[in-house]
Amino acid sequence: EEPDLVRLAEVLSLAAQVEQPLLRRARLAAVPAAGPELEGRFWFSPLAESAGVDHLLVDPRAADVLRDRLRERPADLAAAREVIRAAHEHADPAVVLFEQVVALSLEPDADAERVAEHLLRLATTMAEDRARAPDVARWVLRHVPRLPRAVPPRP
């Protein structure tokens, strides 16, 4: 296990997709002493799935484990959420809503109702523009499997 690579992956596990600017921002925030070669190691690691020219997706099984690890460290989780939020501030609304669902599911007081409300907003946002139907279908196929496994039960 490479601690720097895992730390970087934990941050990126909260993202709907990882573009180069987000990868760089996450590295600088999570592992500032590491050089840019860490970004390349992540891009071509088994943690990355569907790596393309301009972005990649984090493997969904790995993302669940990485998110669980991050949940155990609230300060690191908050910092990671801020990295993702800042990087995707002007991203497609579906990306932002997906990331909000992920973030909500990791809150200590997460409940299924709040997550369901965000999922409904996500579906509504994606369905509003019928011209984007093929893009929406592709997005759903790629991102629905990446939603968090489950919302933690309430104590």
Whereabouts are the PLM-identified features?
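Alpha-helix capping and helix-coil boundary motifs
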Residues: 1, 34-36, 109-115
